[in-house]
């Protein structure tokens, strides 16, 4: 090294250290979003309601505002409590907020297939493009006849066994997905593929809950314990989730692929996607992405939302009567509603919106993850933190939704009697991670709701003295929230309606 260069080396080193110190000081002086104080190591984990963490987050908003910072077992989390903040960050700055947290346990719990959990990458873009091509609004309309047919099957199932209405709703939601994605016509009763898919999803949403996911991510050794080891319940749950998910991904895909290859498949996501496949360019990669993205469709909110709709109708009989009166006035009783009637039934539309708002089935959605640091309203949001959109808090915004715990479809009407422009899209997520199948899901929800309202009354259960009582039930835990075993008296609106008579009405409606 020359003497002249040796003179500059210390100066360069000092300059580097000075710049580093200035940057470090500048970062340390930046203010993180406000939030509750936590304990060492545990952070705020013990403060959370383990079954309904969104309730705790919403309570924190009243003290700390619409953007808060907390730590859960050492993991930094930013919670967005209002639509305004969520849109400002997750949509307007989507280049920073479109990633997902790095989940090292994805393989262990069998969620590698899940497009929604993929990191923001070329792999995710391929998955999303495949799904979007089949379920974008103009493409999803091709499935309307299938959704109508499945809604009619739902009615027939409930007429036969009204006490199993919740199971019929679950079968409706799954069978619509199976038909649209795999061209699989599910059996009305106890279809093996539907049962396998339902079992897989129920275990997955439990193991993927916020609290469980954080525990597994912080203490991954829990998944390395022998399944027989005392206290290894999470390990056993992960094994069950992995096994169930593998069956849910592989079996229906093999069925659909075989039908495509033998030219016996009707239009569905799989057949459409194979028509677009470029055999000269990563065909294997495309097929793997197709198999995974198609299975992601099972993580659907339709069944959960419809069960919440039933609860809303029981607890708000006036809303139920008004919706049914509108249907009778527009359509009559000689046929069932179709999609062509949708624009003529604004109150039914308001019932759907209120169902989505009243109890969001994904109260926290899925967490985002910052790919870079950011500043918002003088608050510093570091790179590499989990960002959660608290959908529940947004649904409880009293400035926008007065008396938010009431089921009140009237809140979606303007003074002139027209529907307002609030379609409750926040329930489907934000930014580039918004649910790509929301148009398809919305259509399934509407045709099911309007068909159920046209055909049945949803009444509170009776006590031993024959008096109506409020239903007693529990809510699911995990990333999806809906009533479990919701007691309800489902009665035909037209006494004497049999399966045969309903079939005749259905024939007049198609």
Regions found by a protein language model. Name each.
Residues 2-109, 148-153, 382-383, 424:
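N-terminal membrane-proximal hinge/A-helix region immediately C-terminal to the signal-anchor transmembrane segment
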Residues 37-55, 76, 103-182, 195-258, ...:
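Cytochrome P450 catalytic-domain helical core, especially the substrate-recognition surface
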Residues 45-58, 63-65, 247, 334-378, ...:
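Conserved cytochrome P450 K-helix E-x-x-R motif and the immediately C-terminal K′/meander segment
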Residues 79-89, 98, 183-194, 300-325, ...:
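Classical protein tyrosine phosphatase
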Residues 173, 241-254, 278-328, 355, ...:
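Central I-helix of cytochrome P450 enzymes
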Residues 317-319, 439-483, 491-497:
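Cytochrome P450 heme-binding "Cys pocket" and the immediately downstream C-terminal segment
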Residues 375, 389-417, 505-506:
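Conserved cytochrome P450 K-helix/beta-meander segment immediately N-terminal to the heme-binding cysteine loop
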Residues 414-447, 472-477:
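Cytochrome P450 heme-thiolate "Cys pocket" and heme-binding signature region
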């Amino acid at each position: 090294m020359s003497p002249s260069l040796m003179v500059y080396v210390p100066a360069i080193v000092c300059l580097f250290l000075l710049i580093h110190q200035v940057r470090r000081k500048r970062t340390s002086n930046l203010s993180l979003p406000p939030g509750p104080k936590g304990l060492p190591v545990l952070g705020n984990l013990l403060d959370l309601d383990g079954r309904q963490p969104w309730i705790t987050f919403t309570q924190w908003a009243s003290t700390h505002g619409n953007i808060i910072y907390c730590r859960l077992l050492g993991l930094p989390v930013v919670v967005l409590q209002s639509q305004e903040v969520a849109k400002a960050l997750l949509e307007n700055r989507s280049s920073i907020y479109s990633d997902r947290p790095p989940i090292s346990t994805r393989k262990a719990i069998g969620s590698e297939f899940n497009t929604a959990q993929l990191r923001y990458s070329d792999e995710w873009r391929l998955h999303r493009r495949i799904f979007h091509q089949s379920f974008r609004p103009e493409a999803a309309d091709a499935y309307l006849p299938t959704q109508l047919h499945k809604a009619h099957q739902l009615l027939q199932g409930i007429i036969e066994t009204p006490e199993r209405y919740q199971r019929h709703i679950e079968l409706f939601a799954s069978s619509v997905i199976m038909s649209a994605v795999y061209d699989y016509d599910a059996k009305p009763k106890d279809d093996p593929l539907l049962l396998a898919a339902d079992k897989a999803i129920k275990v997955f949403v439990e193991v993927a809950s916020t609290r469980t996911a954080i525990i597994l991510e912080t203490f991954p050794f829990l998944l390395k314990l022998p399944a027989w080891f005392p206290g290894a319940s999470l390990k056993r749950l992960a094994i069950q989730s992995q096994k169930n998910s593998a069956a849910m991904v592989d079996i229906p895909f093999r069925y659909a692929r075989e039908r495509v290859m033998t030219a016996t498949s009707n239009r569905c996501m799989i057949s459409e996607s194979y028509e677009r496949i470029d055999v000269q360019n990563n065909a294997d990669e495309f097929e793997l992405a197709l198999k995974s993205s198609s299975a992601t469709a099972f993580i659907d909110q339709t069944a959960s939302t419809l069960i919440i709709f039933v609860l809303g109708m029981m607890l708000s009989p006036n809303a139920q009567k008004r919706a049914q009166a509108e249907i009778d006035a527009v359509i009559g009783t000689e046929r069932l509603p179709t999609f062509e009637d949708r624009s003529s039934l604004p109150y039914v539309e308001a019932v759907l919106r209120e169902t989505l708002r009243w109890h969001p089935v994904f109260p926290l959605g899925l967490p985002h993850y910052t790919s870079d640091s950011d500043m918002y309203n003088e608050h510093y949001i570091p790179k590499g933190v989990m960002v959660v959109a608290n959908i529940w808090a947004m649904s409880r915004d009293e400035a926008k939704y007065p008396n938010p715990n009431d089921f009140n479809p009237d809140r979606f009407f303007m003074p002139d009697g027209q529907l307002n422009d609030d379609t409750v899209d926040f329930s489907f997520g934000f930014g580039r991670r918004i649910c790509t199948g929301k148009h398809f899901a919305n259509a399934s929800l509407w045709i099911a709701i309007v068909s159920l309202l046209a055909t049945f009354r949803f009444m509170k259960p009776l006590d031993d003295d024959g008096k109506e009582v409020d239903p007693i039930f529990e809510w699911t835990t995990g990333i999806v929230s809906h009533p479990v075993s919701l007691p309800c008296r489902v009665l035909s609106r037209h006494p004497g309606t049999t399966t045969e008579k309903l079939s005749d009405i259905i024939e007049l409606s198609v």
